[in-house]
Structures are given as structure tokens and as C-alpha cells.
């Protein structure tokens, strides 16, 4: 199988640039190639291998109908996280991680329900008959909920996998996933402890192009996995016997959409 991304793509996106040598986590030493002008250079041979591993893992979970949550609240990640999660038909948090998003899922669901209620009120004419001051307050509440919960509004359950950009910044999200045993796939820079991460992708987590490249690869894996899931579905015809039992008379694969 060809590599998910090429060395050229990684270099062009600046995936190899780590943090300053004085800001490093020694546990990332196995993923560092060298240092240049006070900056650690990530070993892209290892990045390629681990990105392939991450891709295959995400694809396999997608084939089983898995739910994925993309997390990246730093400015450089916000757009890519939302766009790539949406492209893959998945969910995202790209503003602030609300504590308990995973570990207190019931409470989060109640806030999502409130968001949906407010959206419905804004669309069904309810806002038109309420006092302007009340509408302003409700609109403010709706906008705030949309900002923080819009990306998980339709998430049916707790996710099967978290994909995280900068687990150092998103340490609360990673910790909640660890508590619940949810696997974490993450872009891990040279200043970060890789231990809480199940599938490490050693990479620059500060460059917009690097984030877009790797988040895009993870979305591609999900899309491919979901396609495989669709391809494997079959139509089964049954015949009812005189004794009331049923037997399969034909089974054929569904045509691709």
C-alpha cells in the first residue's frame, strides 16, 4: 500500500518543524531527527509510518460504523477541524472544550437539546411574537450554544475515537477520553507528552498547512472506511417454508451509490 502522504507533501506543509529545543518533552526524543538553529526537526520517516498506522486505524473503525470527534480549538486548527470533520460526516469541537463533554454526556445532551429548541423557535415564528429584549437574550444564548456545541449537535452518542490537534492544549479532552477508554489519535509536537495518546502522529501542530494535511488524511480514512462499509452491505431474500421456517434463497451485494 502506498503511503498516505508523501515526504514532499510533509516537507511542503512544514510538518517537520518542532518547537524550540528548550521547550521540549524528553518522551518525544524517539521521534526527533535532529536540531537546527535551536529548533527540533521531527523524523518524517517515523511520521509517515505512524500516519499510515493512524489512517488504517481510522479506516477500520469507520468500516464498523464508528463515530469520530475531531478536536482542535487553537486558531490555526479551527477551520480545518470543522471542514474535515464535516467532509467525513463526523463531528467536531473547534472553539472551547466544555469540561464534561464526554464524561458528563447527559448534561451536554441537555444543552444540545436547548440549542435545537432555540433554533426551532427562531425558525417557526416564535421569535416574531416575543418582546425584542427577550429575543435578544434568546439569540445571544443560541449563538453561544451554537459556537460551543454546533459541531456535536447531531452526534448520536459518545464517540469511538478522538482525533486531536495539540493534545497539550486539549489536555482536558484527552483526559476525559482516557477515563472512558476512548482511543485518541493525535498530532503530537516535540513539546508534548505522548503517553496519553493511543496513536501518535509526530508533527508540527502549529502550522495551518500541516494541520490541514493531516486532518485531511484522517477524514480521507473515514470516508474510505465508510465506503467499504457500504460496499459490503448485501441484500438477502428469504423464502418461507410450509413449516413456518425461513431460508435464504439469494444474497447479492447492493450496487454502489
Swiss-Prot record:
Residues 226-257 are annotated as: Disordered. Gene3D superfamilies: Glucose-6-phosphate isomerase like protein, domain 1, Helix hairpin bin. Residues 244-257 have a biased composition (Acidic residues). PROSITE patterns: RIBOSOMAL_S2_1, RIBOSOMAL_S2_2. GO terms for cellular component: cytosolic small ribosomal subunit. Keywords: Ribonucleoprotein, Ribosomal protein. Belongs to the universal ribosomal protein uS2 family. This is Small ribosomal subunit protein uS2. It comes from Lactobacillus helveticus (strain DPC 4571).
